Every structure is written in C-alpha cells, then in structure tokens.
C-alpha cells in the first residue's frame, strides 16, 4: 500500500458502520525514513489550462461533463447524519484514443500512473503506449512502445440473482450504486521511463462487449478519464544518524 507522509485507514464495523462495540486494531509499518514514490505531475481532464500545458489530444473525446458523486468509502448517512457528502468533478469519455505528456523524475525506477474515472462505464480496457515527450509545437510522431493493457473490471452496477424457490428460476435484480468515483493505477516499467524527465502517453480504448448477464442489453462502453497523476519510483534519500 504506497503512501506519502500518512495513510488514512477506515474500518467499517457492521453493515453500515453502525456497530458501537469495543474494537482495537494494530498496524505495523515497515519502511525507510524517505519516500520511494513521489508525485511528479498531474493532468486534470476538462480543465483547459491543464489540458493545454500537458499537450492533451483526444479527437474522439466527449465534451467535458460534471458529475456529483462519491468514492466507495462507507454509508452516505448514518442515523440522520451525513457521513460522506457528495463532491463534484469534471472529466471526459473517449471511444478512440487520448495522448498527453507528464513530467517524471529522470532518476526514476519506473512510474505509477493513477487515473480518476467515472465507474459508471463498465469493464474499461485500453492499450497503453509510451514514447518520448516532444517540445510544444513539434508534430513529429513519437516512437511508441507498448506498456501493456490497462483493464478495470466491473462498474457501479451489479446484478443479484435470487430465485424465489430453492430450485426456481433465477431472478435477476440489477442495482446501481451512487459511487461513481474510482481511482485505478497502471505501472509503467523502468525501461520505458529511465533517464526521461517527461513521457508521452497514449491510451487507446478497447471495448469489452460483455453484458451484465446473458440477455441483458449491452451498456454504453467508453474509457473515462477525469485525472491522470504520475508518481515516480525513486531511490530513497536519507542519512543514517
């Protein structure tokens, strides 16, 4: 579990965190007194200035849209009190490809790319390609190298199959939660990032045409992008006393 100066760990007691019984937990941390993963850049999709400074290009992308939602953290309300209020954010969807440039540490040992997304679009899959960053205004195509496939299964919609009788026919009940925000991460190997102060990233959408269950209409498929954050793996720097 990578983290910076601190980590917030939430434990849910009971189905909706309603249990008031005594509970204790102990956490052990094994690490070094210096960071080995540092944030080096962030692209906010839907923000014109951020898209421009990161040379964001996505010809088939939707216009920016705003949603008010939550992460999968816990109950919205408990005993009439709102625990996790909804927040608003902007993003786009694409059914083609997106390209952008992110700064990284030249002495990196690899890069972790984190994406904030709209989880209402199921089974998001894309090919990831990495190339050398180009100066602004230069249109030469990078020499792309494959970094792998980025896949996030599922969505905020699920199906419960509860037959009325023990041997009865399946009864599909489809439910959609209000948690549309989600973070997902993709690791870029060092051979594609070492010695570079910035990288050009290409994400090409590959649809997964699988219905929620046989006979259910195929949902709207797209690659969602709200924010891309680059974290560089670095050698920890510290002095022994």
Predicted feature descriptions by range:
Residues 1, 81-112, 116-240:
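Beta-strand-rich ligand-recognition modules
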Residues 1-54:
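Charged, alpha-helix-forming regions
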């Amino acid at each position: 579990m990578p983290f910076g100066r601190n980590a917030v760990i939430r434990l849910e007691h009971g189905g909706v965190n309603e249990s008031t019984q005594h509970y204790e937990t102990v956490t052990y941390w094994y690490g070094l007194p210096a960071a080995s993963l540092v944030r080096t850049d962030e692209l906010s999709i839907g923000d014109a200035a951020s898209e421009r400074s990161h040379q964001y290009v996505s010809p088939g992308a939707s216009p920016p849209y705003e949603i008010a939602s939550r992460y999968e953290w816990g109950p919205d309300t408990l005993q009439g009190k709102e625990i996790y209020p909804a927040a608003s954010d902007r993003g786009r969807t694409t059914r083609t490809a997106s390209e952008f440039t992110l700064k990284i540490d030249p002495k990196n040992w690899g890069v972790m790319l984190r994406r904030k997304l709209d989880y209402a679009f199921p089974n998001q899959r894309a090919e990831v390609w990495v190339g050398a960053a180009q100066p602004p205004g230069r249109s030469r195509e990078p020499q792309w190298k494959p970094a792998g496939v980025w896949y996030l299964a599922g969505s905020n919609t699920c199906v419960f199959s509860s037959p009325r009788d023990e041997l009865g026919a399946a009864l599909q009940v489809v439910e959609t939660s209000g948690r549309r925000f989600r973070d997902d991460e993709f690791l870029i190997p060092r051979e594609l990032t070492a010695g570079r102060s910035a990288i050009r990233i290409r994400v090409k959408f590959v649809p997964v045409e699988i219905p929620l269950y046989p006979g259910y209409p195929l949902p709207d498929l797209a690659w969602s992008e709200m924010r891309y954050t680059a974290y560089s793996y670095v050698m920890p720097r510290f002095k022994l006393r």
